[in-house]
């Protein structure tokens, strides 16, 4: 067996290199220690044969050629790095002041990258030649003369270079390749001797020591319970596996002990537990809830008739089955892992919540997501704000700035790669000093951050409940990724205050994500569910906190069974793990299932087709006993009666007292001017633009997103609600679902009940921007974050839960069927601590009648006499409360009087009014935006920003304090744009629902002739403030811009920021050279005969559903074809007239975006011949590729005739994944090339918006300038990015990737192949377009203009 070392491409772009130099310099307390840095990947190849043949070596080199090569011809340092890597030289061989640092996967492990790269190599014919391929990173660093770099590096300074959980660092010598590929011997089983011979130590002393060393977080009662079970009942010592499993299964994180505790407050025993009060909401309003509190997510009856659109299990033809599809809802938090390791912590937070939505009932599926973050003050270097506090942090916990740079990327990356659109969220910062009731200073803030991940999904009605029992003998299966020693003890670690435990235990508790694996698992679940009555899944759970130690026992416990397991059947990437580590690690992307032995072969076939790993690890038993055997070590790690594990350790009792903070009233005399207040408030992150958090996340995948965060022709992120269409199917469906968030944690410093009520009310005011069916249809998820053990916080928690469970929610008729709690929201280190306020995050979910009736803050320009109307639900209050407002926060105040819901009936009447306003035939409401963070002024400004217009804002006169109160109070309310002629109708509907005229007032009007914002004293008509829309919007966008500049390429951040000032920018537009209405007739004409199109996907592809639907709507028969189908002969391309390569992340973009997929075609003889014949020999075929499919086709250019000068698609100039709506033009070249295209016939010259979502879309011509020239001369570019003026552009963000000459789509000379980076298939439903002109829904029949592309192909076929 021979090992090879091959230098790879550049690992870091110049922008990333500059950032890394800056980071390492800062950690070494210098600005100029490092002069230069070069980077590359290293490929380690473990050969099977003694020596690879020359042909095999060349193939291997081709496979491992991707991204940008080192410039060894012109750069001496790059050449030195390449030679040192190729020859495996130590750092000392490079000369003085030059260091070579290598990072490789941790010894004895197999990385996810390795699994995918090895898989590609095997598909390409190297299965008998190459055992495994691994990848490392090499950094060549040149310092100033004489600086001892290695002496100044430590774990903290190197965290920007490697992940010590999964990787190893080599600072001087190169790693021995044997250590990379050699597996360690399994570690032994450990017994904890609770009955030692040394009688000086009691069993409790010994268990207490193990409790600390293992990070079990057991309380005294639980330790007594375990001692009784093992010492007194079983009369034996427990194993470390049994103790660790018990700790995870019974942790606060998993069992919610505080919410089930008995409470005594101020000496009075309380009548209800917290959970009982939450359940009360469901008890009083159970309508439309199918499942609550009993599964991984709550299941709702949406009452929306829809289609189950999926491939037929036999023919693989995409078919529509008409059925009502229940909605499932879930919101999770991943706070502790995000504090420790922000990127993987947030990534696995989203991944875990996605699995919850996939493991509901007997198999389900996520549909769309949300994410949110609360952190302490950002302290952006060079952009520190006057109210921000810098109080330090524990050394091993990430700063707020690092969290907000890395964590959103982690969450977005997982969602993107899995294929889940993220269309809602929030972002808040807080660090403030307050005095407790004794006058002692406390720091309140989010050093322990909140990372929230949630969303909703769907489940077929027959599988909504876990009502098919697992029976004795059922196969117990682990589906998904192989286990590794990561995420150990996450359930227990997240149940204690951060910073209290050991840094090593904290770090060990963070999982790592592999979204492409989770996508494969979801495909398995989808295929099982598509079998209908033959679904082999009896029951399913996701593997989360506690790993298999929680999931597998829970699976059988649900069915009152026991189980017997073989621990060595658990698939592992790390054979050296001990039994405890195998059983308890929290490796991600895993599900546990029960499958009948008779159905095992069906399940196995599905997994094989999807390349999803699985193992039968045990069987259910009638005896309620949990036995885990280890045949390798010949031990029994677990032998427990199920009641011991799931029995009843002593029920928790909580005693607390009511203690209010000592808060002074608001002091507005400290505020120098209205201008200063506006400037500061616009810079507060909770108020300002969240664009930097949104553009990194795909918001168009599935083709069902009818309202995302960005609004209008100028794409400003101000939407109140996220909305999806119900389903794809035979026809356009107008129904849908909505979700919206509400959270008011700062108010909890003043009043817990007010904070809770405001959070619910805010979520409702947001969700009612959508055409919600009724209040009873709305269901809430409540996520409670509390430092429950902090003095006075227990009573606040009880007060808040009581306010919702026994008061507001019953009064409104809304239920809370799902939720989560995190009860350790405190960070401690040294002699410092930062305590979070009680934070209730409410997410409202509801079915929607008509998604096209969703209101947005975009002001309607087609009316001359509209006014802006405020409905102020606090109108009867003599004074407005400024407590906990953004205004006070930016002047380091909290205040002592909070807004609240003063009258439940008025709020309910207002919400009923919104339902009726939506139902009016005439659009009475032209625009809508609720009043929230920042108050009335921010509500109005956001409407102006979205609309690129001016405003005249009228407020009552008075002094500065009066002006500040009117403009910045955050009392409940909303602003409506109403035409003057409809004002009386609007008022009448509100009055009839109990909202009297005193609640309604005109506060201004829009000005579409100017972009000046004026605030006018309505008493004197004096202008008391004036500024331009562009300057105010830039101030509002400043935090987002600064974060984007730190995280992404600063040049593109600056270009986008500058574009805000272009007052003449006309925005998105539809300048079409064809009439989309004609396509309705074409669709009917072509639907009788349906030629077959292969909807082609490789592992990791996620955009097949919307692609299949578009071809179906165009008159084709769409067939689900995987690469394994072609490799194994289940399908042949001869069977199809068309081929559509779908978007996603094939092989997780390992070996380059689309490259692994393409190489599996080019270097597999049988498959290559199929594709070659399809492109070259047949004249009746066409091929289309979008995004990843475009990258795939572009790399097949050698077998597509005339396409040798096609570009490749490389990393975006922004160095970031970009999800945007961009304008493109269908090229109208001198040779009329677009008219030759099978797809673009009749569209030439059209300019229109399209969805974009990719990280590697820059068209790059690597051979020479002549390649680009020849490409353009041959007319092979058929789609180009244009700016809003219609000019071809390379400017960001109008060109989202920096593509040369604006290249967005390319075609073959014969017009039969089209490859494009944007996504037409995602916007063929008109509502899936973020914006379209008024009146087009009826005119175009619900279809978007891009449906023409697919119907043109159908006409070409004839």
From Swiss-Prot:
ATP binds at residues 345-356, 424-426, 719, 932. Pathway: Purine metabolism; IMP biosynthesis via de novo pathway; 5-amino-1-(5-phospho-D-ribosyl)imidazole from N(2)-formyl-N(1)-(5-phospho-D-ribosyl)glycinamide: step 1/2. The modification N-acetylthreonine is found at residue 2. The keyword Protease does not apply. It comes from the Eukaryota. InterPro entries: Class_I_gatase-like, FGAR-AT_N, FGAR-AT_PurM_N-like, PurL_large, PurL_linker, PurM-like_C_dom, PurM-like_C_sf, PurM-like_N_sf. The active site is at residues 1187, 1319, 1321. Mg(2+) binds at residues 720, 762, 766, 930. Pfam families: AIRS_C, FGAR-AT_linker, FGAR-AT_N, FGAR-AT_PurM_N-like, GATase_5. It is an enzyme of class 6 (ligase). GO terms for biological process: 'de novo' IMP biosynthetic process; purine nucleotide biosynthetic process. Phosphoribosylformylglycinamidine synthase involved in the purines biosynthetic pathway. Catalyzes the ATP-dependent conversion of formylglycinamide ribonucleotide (FGAR) and glutamine to yield formylglycinamidine ribonucleotide (FGAM) and glutamate. Present with 40800 molecules/cell in log phase SD medium. HAMAP family: PurL_1. In the N-terminal section; belongs to the FGAMS family. This is Phosphoribosylformylglycinamidine synthase. The lineage of its organism: Eukaryota, Fungi, Dikarya, Ascomycota, Saccharomycotina. The gene is ADE6.
